[in-house]
Amino acid sequence: MQDTMSIANQLWQARLNGDVLDDLPSPASIEAAYELQALINQVSGQEIIGYKIGATSKEIQQLLNVDSPFYGPLYKDYSNPIDAAVPVHTKHTPRVEAEFVVVLKEALTADNSASISRQQVEQLSLIHI
């Protein structure tokens, strides 16, 4: 069985080269998946400029075989201006997905509350769709 760092390296190289990997084991839990993502962040050396949320609909969750939304980093080198031509690897079947970007004036503090205060909502400086 491959160690997690080896898998992180393979996944990052596949992203760089546009390769599709079929033979890697899936993480055993969401916690293991986030640990793997942290290693990929380390291996990539990329600057993280924000995070995105994926699998927000039940249909996509079923397609990806997950039971809830998840988050992942946005890398600076992979962000593009609105009018940019974006290369697509020919080994993939491209999909289009709407993404919503929210830019905050300042970082929100992490707490265990599931609610967001009116003050925090007012900290939004820009919403881009």
Give the ranges of each region predicted by the language model.
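Conserved small/polar residues in nucleotide/adenosyl-binding loops
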Residues: I127-I129
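Extended, compositionally biased flexible segments
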Residues: Q2-I116
